[in-house]
UniProtKB/Swiss-Prot annotation:
The gene is Trip12. This is E3 ubiquitin-protein ligase TRIP12. Residues 48-70, 346-358, 1050-1059 have a biased composition (Basic and acidic residues). Belongs to the UPL family. K-HECT subfamily. It catalyses: S-ubiquitinyl-[E2 ubiquitin-conjugating enzyme]-L-cysteine + [acceptor protein]-L-lysine = [E2 ubiquitin-conjugating enzyme]-L-cysteine + N(6)-ubiquitinyl-[acceptor protein]-L-lysine. The modification N-acetylserine is found at S2. It is found in: Nucleus, Nucleoplasm. Residues 1034-1047 have a biased composition (Basic residues). The active site is at C1992 (glycyl thioester intermediate). Pathway: Protein modification; protein ubiquitination. Residues 1529-1603 are annotated as: K-box. It comes from Rattus norvegicus. GO terms for molecular function: nuclear thyroid hormone receptor binding; ubiquitin protein ligase activity; zinc ion binding. Keywords: Acetylation, DNA damage, DNA repair, Nucleus, Phosphoprotein, Transferase, Ubl conjugation pathway. It is an enzyme of class 2 (transferase).
Length: 2025
């Protein structure tokens, strides 16, 4: 579709201006999050980047305020709320006729038949929607009406130029695609063409013109465009949005693209007369696809000339949800806004032009909190005259239809449109025509309105009841043109009829339903607030009062200010206790909304209600309590600087009640609310120290200890185990602890903190910014937003983009307006000086003389002491176990305060259990300057207070070493080369450091403040814009001042210049840019290179944040100053405390290092030093407190590693002997050569355990693994964004930016089409396979024969429906194209962003200067350059071998299976000679001194990691060194877990951004596979889901484990994964057979499998879980012959299970062996079943389902390819009886060997001795054994084995063969098939994260365990009639905790569908088990009924039984009888 000329010569100035922006090709966009969309993924790009950028803003169009005058100046905006029409003389004739019809208001009865015919026609016209399909249709249809056309044409033309234009336009709009969402503006009276998608969006409904409703939300405009884009682009794929009507869906399907081509093709012929009208809103009229571009202008002028006719609805109003942006999910995410081709800059221009268009400059200003929450613009008349609906208002008489269509066609034909076009268009036009005029809702409303205004009450009642019905069934589509303005006053009048309760109640309901169906009507309903409140002040009828509360609650979401100022808060709470619980919730929700932006002047409105609200906190109802908490949190937030108000708020028991609320178990507060409440406490303490003192006296320390550690049992000093909490919760809790302590001083050693906090003292608190609502009231922005705006204002920005609460606003400083990006709503803003600003802006308060906290420390030392003792250890533990910098910085501040204010004695007591010194040492080696400064301050305080103790420890732990290093280092803190930080302008640097790295929070630049929302006096006011990271992404940055030419310092190379010219020169400032904070190193570098006084306006895709003109000098100066301070302080420290080295030797503790060094030297491999040196090491490790620093510096680690692993010729002693010596010393195993005859058993492992712990401490201190987290600390409570999701900003970034790619055919191939579409824009998170899908369905995947045409087939955009369907439906599409960037072949399941970042040439150029690990968004260049992606067809030979991942996997390439040797020769050896391969020793793999191949990372701790890996292997496999050892680990694997690495891994895996981009750090995946023992099972399970499967599954897993991630910004719907689901119905009678076919079809599909049973209504999670459980059971049937074990029948058989035998093996199932002579047919059948089992298990893992198969350990070893190391120990796990006999016989073999080695024996005595060797008194020969497998006489162990007896001489061979056949040879074929099946779903190599014994948990869930009542209480949720205190709930928990294993399984299967719980038990059940009350009629007895369940949501519906016995019986009956059926309960 090419750019079209402006064919509207009469267009106004604004139109021609806009044409440049408008005329551009249509964007398609790749949004490939989901495989479900076949075409909606790529955006062909206009070549001109400037023009391309105009895409996003043309959604604006301001709506002036209500104004009923009709003066000349308002001519551009006719008042659509009037019902009188202009005189008919002024109308063209055609319209007089139509109007007369309309006014009769007849129902459309006559046209019904025609309507149906036309729908039939429409259906017949549907073709696969290819862009050209419709234009090729038969031409005939159009010609039949030509006579009529000519007639009408002449009559129209007579009307002269003005009316002709209107008439022409009236019809011209018809052939356009009447937008699937009708004209927004009409109903709103707001008439703007809003989306480029087409002017059709404006021309879709007949009566919009006549609409009286005035309240379009600006959002609706966006929606229109979005839906059209979707309809146009993703016809074959994307499912229609939920709220679109079915007719509309049809429309969008059939109307897809055909209607656009003719417009494009024929528009040049159209030349319409000039129109006088200017179109302020028609942002893109020229290029709108559906019709000749001039037609829209006509439409508008038509609308103007015909002004008002009678009310009649537009066909459909765009469905407006609360947030109009929520639709941007999934694969079309990018189409919704970008796809339209509208740019933000264009929108800005549109806004400016609109200002010109409206002479009075009226702007619509929206009421109250709409800016912060849901946008609800309500202006009355529109600022532009294109109302967007066709001006037809007839009721649809059939006679007029033909003539209308005819006239329309005639007119268009006369304008040069060929008649054949009307063939395909005719039926559709008339169908749309019918829809627009046939809807009777509006006319019905008019009739009812008359009824409401009647004088007769019965008539009024009837009318109001019908009005309720109309509204409750309606939505925005069906209620188009509803006369809100007239209906509301009429309803308000009825509401005041005090004597008639019925009428009042229904009137109240009608208003509520109206706000639900038409959200914008709330602006008009606001007038009813006083009347609603009247109903609450004097309650005459409780129903009316409750209904009024419901209405007020809806109003309060947008108009809380109006309610507050009408005194509504107190009125709503007046009779709170009288209402039902739902009404109470509403009342409290209103209160919370009223507090949202309350100002100190309005405090009197709430003051009286505070006691009541405080008391409400003790209530049991969760929702009420949360609303009340929200209320207080908002009050505290808004009054945080008003100390006296804070005290009033907290006066009435508030602190006590909240404190109790925090510790209630089970918790009432959700995670987000918990964070908010704790934050509220912090704010109170920080700003009002007296409240802090009050809390201390109320024993807040115990509360905090409980919240962090759970209930303490005994001494809290010993072992501190933290309760698992999210980083955000930890952050707020540590903040609170920090605020409870007095502030630190700001002089002396703490003076540097001022530098850390404030870069330059720019004061952003100096002013308050406010915006004005509809009523002219001013509302303040919340604190953070206000700071962002002020910061931008101070540096002279023209405008900034502010993203808050899911909306994006442009703040325009020139016009002082705030403009909503989505909707174009504009509001006035103003700046007011902040009276409070000067009280305390320095960021540090002077220690006030009356800081009550400091006073308390002096006056009540006991209280202070207990506080510090209770919390110091906990803080310390939080610091050690947190990876996020925000939490660590906050902990550090709190610890510093405690250490500073505690006296020496207390400190000694508190610190004695903590290795403070080694922590300080590792902090000093951190790369984060903030941490280094804190560590130096701490060291200084400790040396001042406890010099004797710490002078020794600081030496031993390496503190002194590090401080000296800091004092001497020239280039301070230069990090390892990989992490160079110079010039980054960031202190919270991102280099690998113990503190974790680049957090989006670290403020890169002079504001070195922590990301955290510091609330304290000393920290609090540093809430710089990034306090909430500001969400600032700016587009246009033309600073008002300063030259416009960039001057760069000499760049490093040409590429840099190029990069800088195109990319933002993000000069950073104290308040820093968004991306700089994400990766200071990368983005900061640009700032260091550009001269700050001459800033080029950065224009790229929003990559720069608040780019500020802060001089380079200030930034680097500040950093340099801090570095200088560190160096100077370190120097002073050494001088003061360690200058005299005379202390050496004076303290015995200092000798440890010497001893260790001496022992280490003796671990020499060349000289045999015996075991003495090991004994010395053992004593040092286990008896002295050797420090990590000493271990590091003695060379011990490296030497021990070599000692245990080296295998060189030169070694004096062999490795095996060294290992045995080591085991002897550390584990008391026998020395080499002294093994006993009996079993070698583990004795004492304490020394080895001590060594492991010491090594783990070393690892924790040395490792510097980077963590890519994006700590986005929360905003404040007032905006409700209290848990603003970390990572969501960056996700937003990905949602709003696309990569520019050029698709090119690979030079190597010429047999596929060449892409001619120019550059495309691709969603960065789309997968590479989305590009393939996009190209293949357009025919680019077809390989041409040589003789076919080359590239001129011109059918680029033709979509092959069959291929599209194939892509949609099949999980296993054959790949047709492969893609390259440069030489690199791209994996299909890689995101495009990852591919570009990893392989693009630019990426390679940049990598030298970028620390790739830590930068999630890549360099600016990634977003500005065009990346070339080559495609070529997949070669046949490659296809078969390719391991295609991402759900389209073929068989993965894996190592050849090492089962019994495959080739014939070896087979012969086994069969003929009985020679079997020797058992592999698993230890060998680990005993290497160098890193294994799959460890590629570098880290200072690498040697320690390798040593721990060796120690773990020795502990796990030591028994392979002895031939008679007990098979048992020395040390449990759990002892090897490293808490610091675990914290880092967990933190990393909780970050949505990292998971979405697949950007997991390499160290984590590599350690996870090579050293899984460092991490607990659940961490590895999460890591497995993140790395093994697609991104959506990883996100789903993340959301299941951390539900709070999705609690914030709902518009970030991209966080929500889009997992396809495939549903299959199966028959219970043939379950196994059907399961096999389901797995055959869908096993390898990426879609989630859902199962339903024939003739049962249940569907969803429960039946699916039961399917896996039942199939597992079917596979255990004895008749299948799959397993070893005994046959049993089920204890509680159902249906077909009766009489069926099943296999049971208490040790676990293992495959039944085959002999050499087994029948091939039988083998094939069994192999098929095993292949199916492999698929089933892999699919279960992939879909988070559980199977119920009790498999044995050897089975899992086979899965992990460990079959070569199976020994007789493993035999015990499949057949204990045989295994015991084998053990006895092995003992005989060992005795025989001893005898043979005994030199003293003669031949005769040896013979005699051998004959006396017996087993239970029998000689071997007497046992009567032959060479067959025990238990399987038909399986021979070697050829002719039946006839070979076992004797003492061949006993050893016999035992080897038995073990080999039972565990390997006999079962290898089954396991090969199993592995094949498994790998067809995903590669088995991904299971390397687990040990064999853990796979059972992964597959089958948690082990059977008794359930205790306490756990049940914490994990189960009573609801709907029950609470934790209900009798029935207590009964239930008591019963469940008494269940045995079988009863547990029955109960679980009944309630959840699966007999097993996931790992973690009830705690991990998702959704949680919910117990609800089953209700009955009053006449019924609950004891007569059984409980029922909803398995999909784990609901147990439990009657309230009279006794525990009855409940127990009923539960067991239900559980037994309720199996295997899903019917309605």
């Amino acid at each position: 579709m090419s750019n079209r000329p402006n064919n509207n010569p009469g267009g106004s100035l604004r139109r021609s201006q806009r044409n440049t922006a408008g005329a551009q090709p249509q964007d398609d966009s790749i949004g490939g999050r989901s495989c479900s969309s076949s075409s909606a993924v790529i955006v062909p790009q206009p070549e001109d980047p400037d023009r391309a950028n105009t895409s996003e803003r043309q959604k604006t169009g301001q709506v002036p305020k209500k104004d009923n005058s009709r003066g000349v100046k308002r001519s551009a905006s006719p008042d659509y709320n009037r019902t009188n029409s202009p005189s008919s003389a002024k109308k063209p004739r055609a319209f007089q006729h139509i109007e007369s019809l309309s006014e009769t208001n007849k129902p459309p009865s006559k046209s019904k038949k025609r309507h149906l015919d036309q729908e039939q026609q429409l259906k017949s016209a549907q073709l696969p929607s290819t862009s050209k399909a419709h234009t090729r249709k038969s031409v005939a249809a159009g010609s039949s009406r030509s006579q009529k056309r000519k007639r009408t044409e002449s009559s129209c033309v007579k009307s002269g130029s003005g009316s002709e234009s209107t008439g022409a336009e009236e019809r011209s709009a018809k052939p356009t695609k009447l937008a699937s969402k009708s004209a927004t503006s009409a109903k709103a009276g707001c008439s703007t063409i809003t989306d480029s998608s087409s002017a059709a969006s404006t021309s879709s409904s007949s009566s919009a013109v006549a609409s009286a409703s005035s309240t379009v939300p600006a959002g609706a405009r966006v929606k229109q465009g979005k839906d059209q884009n979707k309809a146009r682009r993703s016809r074959s794929a994307s499912s229609p949005s939920p709220r679109r009507s079915s007719r509309e869906k049809e429309q969008s399907k059939t109307g897809g693209s055909s209607k656009f081509d003719w417009a494009a093709r024929f528009s040049p012929k159209v030349s319409l007369p000039k129109t006088k009208l200017s179109l302020p809103g028609s942002s893109k009229s020229e290029t709108s696809k559906p019709g000749p571009s001039g037609l829209q202008a006509k439409l508008a002028s038509l609308r103007k000339s015909t002004k008002k006719r009678s009310e009649s609805p537009p066909a459909e109003l765009p469905s407006l949800r609360r947030s109009t942006r929520q639709k941007t999910t999934g694969s079309c995410a990018s189409t919704s806004r970008r796809g339209s081709g509208l740019g933000k800059r264009g929108a800005a221009e549109a806004r400016r032009q609109e200002k010109m268009a409206d002479p009075e400059g009226n702007q619509e200003t929206v009421n109250s909190s709409a800016a912060r929450t849901d946008e609800a613009p309500q202006g009355a008349a529109a600022s532009s005259s294109v109302a967007g609906a066709v001006g037809m208002t007839t009721s649809g008489e059939s006679e007029s239809d033909d003539s209308e269509m005819g006239r329309l066609q005639a007119l268009l034909e006369a304008r040069g449109l060929p008649p054949h076009l009307f063939g395909p268009l005719g039926p559709r036009m008339s169908q749309l025509f019918h829809r627009t005029i046939g809807s009777g809702a509006s006319s019905k409303a008019q009739q009812l309105l008359q009824g409401l205004q009647a004088s007769d009450e019965s008539q009024q009642l009837q009318a109001v009841i019908e009005m309720c019905q109309l509204l409750v069934m309606g939505n925005e589509e069906t209620l188009g043109g509803f006369p809100v303005k007239s209906v509301v006053p009429a309803l308000i009048t009825l509401l005041q009829m005090e004597h008639n309760f019925d009428i009042m109640n229904h009137a109240c309901r009608a208003l509520t339903y109206m706000m639900e169906a038409l959200p914008r009507s709330s602006a008009v309903v606001v007038d009813a607030i006083p009347v609603f409140l009247e109903k609450l002040q004097v309650i005459q009828c409780i129903d009316v009062a409750e209904q009024a509360l419901t209405a007020l609650e809806m109003l309060s979401r947008r108009h809380s200010k109006a309610i507050l100022q009408a005194g509504g808060l107190a009125d709503c709470l007046l009779y709170l206790e009288f209402f039902s619980i739902n009404a109470q919730r509403n009342a409290l929700a209103i209160a919370a909304n009223c507090c949202q932006s309350i100002t100190p002047d309005e405090f009197h409105f709430v003051a009286d209600s505070l006691p009541l609200l405080t008391q409400r906190l003790t209530h049991q109802d969760k929702k009420s309590v949360e609303s009340t908490c929200l209320c207080f949190a908002r009050l505290v937030d808004n009054f945080q600087h008003e100390e006296n108000l804070l005290q009033q708020v907290a006066s009435k028991d508030l602190l006590t009640n909240v404190q109790q609320l925090l510790v209630v178990t089970p918790p009432i507060l959700s995670s987000g609310m918990f964070i908010m409440v704790v934050r509220m406490f912090s704010l109170m303490c920080s700003n009002c120290p007296t409240l802090a003192v009050q809390l201390m006296k109320q024993n807040i320390a115990e509360t905090l200890h409980f919240l962090l550690c759970g209930a303490s049992n005994g001494s809290c000093q010993e072992q501190i185990d933290l309760v698992p909490r999210s980083p955000q919760e930890l952050y707020e809790l540590t903040s609170l602890i920090c605020e409870l302590m007095p502030c630190l001083p700001k002089e002396g050693i703490f003076a540097v903190d001022t530098m850390l906090k404030k870069g330059n003292a720019q004061n952003t608190d100096g002013a308050i910014w406010q915006w004005r609502d509809d009523r002219g009231l001013w509302h303040p922005y919340n604190r953070i937003d206000s700071r962002i705006i002020e910061a931008a204002h101070q540096v002279g920005e023209d405008e900034i983009s502010l993203s808050t609460l899911g909306r994006v606003y442009t703040i325009d400083f020139n016009s002082m307006q705030q403009i909503n990006e989505d909707t174009g709503t504009a509001r006035a803003i103003q700046r007011k000086p902040n009276p409070l600003a000067n009280t305390n802006t320095s960021g540090y308060s002077d220690l006030k003389k009356d800081d009550a906290r400091a006073q308390l420390m002096k006056e009540d030392p006991e209280l202070a002491k207990s506080f510090i003792k209770t919390l110091f250890g906990v803080l310390y533990e939080v610091y050690s176990s947190s990876a996020g910098p925000a939490v660590r910085h906050k902990c550090l501040r709190a610890i510093l305060r405690i250490i500073y204010f505690a006296d020496a004695e207390l400190l000694k007591d508190v610190l004695k259990n903590h290795a403070v010194s080694s922590h300080i040492a590792s902090m000093l080696s951190s790369q984060d300057l903030k941490i280094v400064v804190g560590a130096l301050q701490m060291a200084e305080i400790l040396m001042q207070k406890l010099p004797d103790i710490f002078s020794v420890y600081f030496r031993r732990e390496g503190v002194m070493h590090q401080v000296k290093h800091l004092a001497e280092s020239e280039s301070l803190l230069t990090s390892p080369p990989k992490a160079c930080t110079n010039g980054s302008g960031s202190l919270g640097s991102t280099t690998p450091a113990s503190s974790g790295t680049a957090t989006a929070a670290t403020n890169a630049s002079a504001d070195l403040g922590s990301p955290s929302l510091q609330h304290s006096r000393d920290d609090s006011l540093d809430l710089s814009p990034q306090g909430r990271l500001s969400d600032v992404l700016k587009r246009k940055r033309l600073p008002k001042r300063g030259p416009r030419r960039p001057k760069y310092s000499p760049p490093r190379d040409d590429d840099k210049v190029d990069n800088q010219a195109k990319s933002p020169t993000t000069t950073q400032s104290p308040k820093s840019s968004f991306l700089a904070s994400l990766n200071p190193k990368t983005w900061g570098r640009l700032s260091a290179q550009s001269n700050s006084n001459n800033i080029e306006p950065a224009r790229t895709a929003g990559v720069s944040g608040l780019a500020r003109a802060a001089s380079k000098d200030t930034i680097s100066n500040n950093r340099e100053k801090i570095k200088g301070w560190i160096k100077e302080q370190a120097h002073k420290f050494v001088e003061r405390y360690f200058s005299s080295e005379n202390m050496d030797g004076s303290n015995p503790a200092l000798n440890v290092l010497q001893r260790l060094c001496a022992a280490t030297e003796q671990l020499n491999l060349q000289v045999d030093g015996g075991a003495e040196c090991l004994v010395e090491i053992r004593s040092i490790v286990s008896e002295s407190d050797v420090s990590s620093f000493e271990i590091q510096h003695s060379g011990f680690v490296k030497q021990l590693l070599l000692y245990l692993t080296s295998k060189s010729e030169k070694d004096a002693v062999s490795r095996e002997i060294r290992l045995k010596r080591f085991l002897h010393v550390f584990f008391s195993s026998p020395l080499p050569g002294e093994e006993p005859v009996g079993r070698v058993e583990p004795v004492g492992h304490a020394p080895l355990l001590a060594l492991v712990h010491k090594m783990n401490n070393c690892l924790s201190q040395m490792e510097q693994f980077p963590v890519k987290v994006h700590d986005f600390p929360s905003g404040n409570g007032s905006g409700g964004s209290f848990s603003l999701n970390r990572g969501s900003q960056a996700l937003k970034f990905f949602n709003t930016h696309q990569l520019k790619c050029q698709l090119q055919r690979h030079p190597d191939c010429a047999n596929v089409k060449q892409w001619k579409g120019g550059p495309v824009k691709i969603d960065p998170l789309a997968l590479v396979q989305a590009i393939e899908r996009y190209l293949v369905v357009r025919g680019y995947g077809r390989v041409r024969e040589d003789d076919e045409d080359s590239d001129d087939d011109g059918s680029d955009e033709e979509i092959d429906e069959s291929l599209a369907a194939q892509f949609l439906n099949s999980g296993n599409v054959r790949h047709r194209l492969q893609f390259y960037i440069g030489e690199h072949l791209l994996p299909y399941n890689m995101t495009v962003y990852q591919a570009v970042r990893q392989f693009s040439v630019q990426a390679e150029d940049e990598r030298e200067s970028t620390d790739d690990e830590s930068n999630p968004l890549g360099r600016a260049g990634i977003w500005t350059k065009t990346h070339t992606i080559w495609y070529k067809p997949v070669r046949e030979d490659e296809e078969s071998s390719k391991d295609c991942v991402g759900g389209k996997r073929g068989r993965a390439q894996t190592a050849p299976t090492k089962t019994s040797p495959r080739n014939a020769k070896k087979h012969d050896e086994l069969w003929h000679d009985g020679v079997c391969p020797s058992v592999a020793n698993p230890l060998e793999v680990y005993l290497i001194p160098t890193p294994p191949e799959n460890i590629t990372f570098e880290d200072p701790s690498l040697d320690v990691i390798l040593l721990l890996r060796v120690l773990h292997a020795i502990s796990r496999y030591w028994y392979y060194l002895y031939d008679n050892a007990m098979c048992k680990e020395i040390i449990p694997t759990s002892e090897f877990i490293n808490s610091k690495l675990t914290a880092k891994a967990n933190r990393q895996l909780q970050d949505p951004l990292v998971i979405m981009t697949g950007n997991i750090p390499t160290w984590l995946t590599e350690l996870g596979k090579t050293c899984p023992f460092f991490f607990p099972f659940d961490t590895r399970q999460m890591l497995f889901y993140v790395t093994a499967f697609d991104r959506d599954r990883a996100m789903q897993r993340l959301l299941d484990t951390n539900p709070e991630i999705n609690q914030s910004d709902s518009q970030d719907s991209r966080v929500a994964p889009r997992l396809d689901r495939k549903k299959r119905t199966v028959n219970r009678e043939e379950l196994l057979k059907q399961a096999e076919s389901v797995m055959q079809d869908l096993g390898s599909s990426r879609a989630m499998l859902e199962i339903q049973y024939e003739n049962e209504v249940g569907t969803g999670l429960g039946p699916t879980l039961e399917f896996y459980a039942l199939v597992s059971q079917e596979l255990q049937r004895a008749d299948l012959g799959l397993w070893r074990g005994e046959e049993v029948t089920l204890s509680n058989p159902k249906g077909s299970q009766e009489g069926t035998k099943y296999i049971q093996n208490l040790q676990g199932l293992f495959a039944l062996p085959f002999g050499r002579t087994a029948k091939p047919a039988h083998i094939a059948k069994v192999k098929m079943k095993f292949r199916f089992l492999g698929k089933l298990m892999a699919k279960a893992i992939m879909d988070f389902r559980l199977v119920d198969l009790p498999l044995g350990l050897p089975f899992y070893k086979w899965m992990l390819r460990q079959e070569t190391s199976l020994t007789s120990h493993d035999l015990f796990d499949i057949d204990p009886v045989v295994a015991r006999s084998v053990y006895h016989l092995e003992d005989i073999v060992r005795q025989k060997k001893r005898l043979e080695q005994d030199k003293s024996q003669t031949k005769e005595s040896l013979q005699y001795a051998l004959e006396t060797l017996t087993m239970n008194g029998c000689s071997v020969e007497d046992l009567g054994l032959d060479f067959t497998l025990p238990g399987f006489p038909n399986i021979e162990l070697k050829k002719g084995g039946k006839d070979i007896p076992v004797t003492i001489h061949n006993l050893e061979e016999y035992l080897r063969l038995v073990i080999f056949w039972a565990l390997n040879e006999g079962v290898c074929r089954q396991f090969d098939s199993f592995r094949d099946g498994f790998e067809s779903v995903f590669p088995l190599s991904h299971l390397q994260y687990f040990y064999p014994e853990e796979l059972d948990q992964l597959l089958c869930g948690s082990k059977a365990d008794t359930w205790d009542a306490k756990t049940l209480m914490e994990c189960c949720r009573p609801d709907h009639g029950y609470t934790h205190d209900s009798r029935a709930v207590k009964f239930l928990f008591e019963i469940l905790s008494s269940f045995d294993n079988e009863q547990q399984r029955l109960f679980l299967q009944f309630v959840t569908g699966s007999p097993r719980l996931p790992v973690g038990g009830f705690r991990s059940l998702n959704p949680p088990l919910t117990i609800v009350r089953k209700t009955f009629e009053s006449t019924e007895n609950p004891d007569d009924f059984l409980p029922s369940v909803m398995t999909c949501v784990n609901y147990l519906k439990l009657p309230d039984y009279s006794s525990i016995e009855i409940m127990r019986d009923k539960l067991l009956i239900a559980a037994r009888e309720g199996q295997q059926s899903f019917h309605l309960s």
